[in-house]
Amino acid sequence: MKNYIKGKHALAISILAVAPLTALAQAPVNTTDSLKLQAIHDSLDLQGVEVVAQKPIVRMTTDKMTYNVQQDADAKTMTLLDMLRKVPMVTVDGQDNVTVKGSASFKVYVDGKPNQMFQNNFSQVAKSMPASMVKSIDVITSPGAKYDAEGTSGVLNIKLMHQNGQSNSDCSNCYNGNVELSLSNKGERANAYIGGQHGKLTYSAMGMFAWQDFGNLKVTNTRLQQTSLGESLQTTDVEFKQKHPFSFGNFTLGYALDSLSTINVSAGVNGGYTNQNMQPRNSFSGGPYGNGFSYVYNSNQRNRFMGANASADYQRWLNADHTSSLTLSYLFDYNPARNRTWTIYNNVSGVTGLTLSNLFSDSRTWGTSHTGQADLTLDLGKGQTLETGTKFISRRNKSDSRLYDIVDCNDVLNDAGSMLYRNLQSIVAGYAQYKLTKEKYNARLGLRYEHTFESVKYAEHSDRNFHKDYGNLVPSGSIGYNITPMSNLGLTYTMRISRPGISQLNPYTDRTDPTALTYGNPSLAVVKSHNVTLAYNFFMPKVMFNVSLSHDYIGNEIENYQFVDADNKYNSTYANNGKSRNTYVDAFIRWVATKSTTLMLNGNVAYGDWKAKELGYHNWGWSANSYIGLEQQLPWKVKGSLGVFAQTRQYNLMGYNSGMQFFNASLTRSFFKDRLELSARYANPMRSHLIINQYNAGKDFSNLTHVSFPLQVIALSVKWNFGNTKKQFGQRQSKINNDFNDSQKKESPVGNMGM
């Protein structure tokens, strides 16, 4: 106490479990003696102390939201897909389609790295994976220059429950893990996890197998078409079952070479398939079909997919404070898939205006990518940070689609309906990003450049080969102001791009439906989007609140559009013919009402406007969705959870999807010092079946699809936890904001929402 004021001073000290202490001290003249205080422990009974505060379940900054899945009681019973319904700015509709801020154009990362298998089959993977295997979910709506520019609505980063390379000095041989089994009326699931540390080595492994069996799915499709012969009506009714097994495994190793260097390696494999056996009934009348006819045919669809990935990262801290670093990374991805469809017509007669033939379609795709990256972060001092780096991606995609006519039980290749082609893509990128934190203000300014070299080669039709290369300059920036230690305000601007996928580019024509043609467009261009977001965050021990206002604009959006051709065939393809403007208000509220009751609201209201001037299409409308949740501590140490999800009609360029409602309830009880966990879950779509209606219309057609899902779910699960520690062996805390770890952002005073 060197710079004190002469006189008497009152010092009040309050320590948990220690009685408040007030000391009166006389500061004598010309003395530098330390003030000595003795804390007097009061006979305070801790049983009378109640601490009511937020769980650290959500962290929000200007450009990123992190949902801590492991702090959510529903993680013990829900799948990852179910959990996403509770995550701010993420929507899951009745057909399990996932969108971020209303858009399906987002990138999926796993542990901070792009994962192509998750990207290609995200809905199927998410509804098979238990939420207990996920540590947290990042919704990065305004990615900085350090992130890839792809994904017009941002990045969804899934962080799994495994260990990182930095070791803990107080844990020389620690480990923990769990084994879980789940049974439901929709399938079974088994998963296991183990992670730990031995000296400087950290490790983790996880595996999961799930089997889902959905029956009594019903689809009715009604299509009206205007033809030169008048109006025609086509109706398809089908009821079928769907089987979906899925398996997943992941292994990681980390080693601390010294106090400044770490190396991490990981490998993962996954796979699954879906089988559908159907007997659709088709009815036709009017126009070229005259008085009408109907027939039943057999359709058998078998779709298989798998993925394998491996990565290695080396990080070197450049100073003792761990604020400057060099990171070198490599990532490999391999993703083959195969889709087979048999279409068999038996005893069909009286058909006019159609040519029906037995067909077998066999389509195989292979995707391989290699990624190398170098990132340099420099602490410039006085709250300034410079980040720069470079990246190279090499992608090789191959598609072999073959159509066979089935003649006398033999498969005869149809050359006109078959296609083999390769898509080669190389991306070179570089970025620089400057960050400043000064008193109550923070700012980020970044610039990224990506140059793409792409070529498509056809094996049988070399005259169709083409090559193109293009560059994209992608700016981003943000500014934030800390209003109080518990609230902040931020404004961000982000430009994003979306390259067309192989399924959108593939010109192969699917002719398995005699009334329709489905194909891609190899001339699609990269999509550019612009986003401006104003966000406000507020936190108190019992209440946390986030609200954001966003506006998106896309001038050349890839639209999946339909039309009827001169042969009366219903065509579905893609084109850069769309312009869209969307304005969103997202809100998240979490309130600890009492020591045993917590309420949550996650909601979104949006207005969208879509145009395709060349096609003469224009649509607009309001939409909203919300999830209201209740967490309750019940007697006998039982944790209960209730949730209701509701969604209004969702619009697009050519129509809409109807709204839906969904109810979820769960109970969880732990035994033997949290070693054993028993959970039960019930999910109900407010009726025996979840009903979804999809409507789209053009100049010469209208199409209505009615889908019915039996989504009532009753599930029981048992989980056994083991190990000699509850530690999470994460990287040591640093002042650097690393995209690959959990370090807290310096610019956000409410970065760690909770304790």
Set out the residue ranges of the language-model regions.
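Short acidic/polar hinge/loop motifs at secondary-structure boundaries
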Residues: 80, 86, 114-141
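Surface-exposed extracellular loop regions of Gram-negative outer-membrane beta-barrel proteins
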Residues: 158-178, 217, 221, 235, 453-455, 485-531, 551-569, 684-699, ...
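N-terminal periplasmic accessory domains that precede
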Residues: 37, 80-83, 122-124, 139, ...
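Outer membrane beta-barrel strand-and-loop segments of large Gram-negative receptors
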Residues: 237, 369-373, 415-419, 519-521, ...
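Outer-membrane beta-barrel signature, preferentially recognizing the C-terminal barrel domain
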Residues: 419-425, 468, 497-546, 553, ...
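Short, acidic, small-residue-rich periplasmic hinge/interaction motif at the N-terminus
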Residues: 27-73, 93-95, 101-105, 140-143
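Face-selective signature of the C-terminal outer-membrane beta-barrel domain
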Residues: 248-272, 297-458, 482, 486, ...
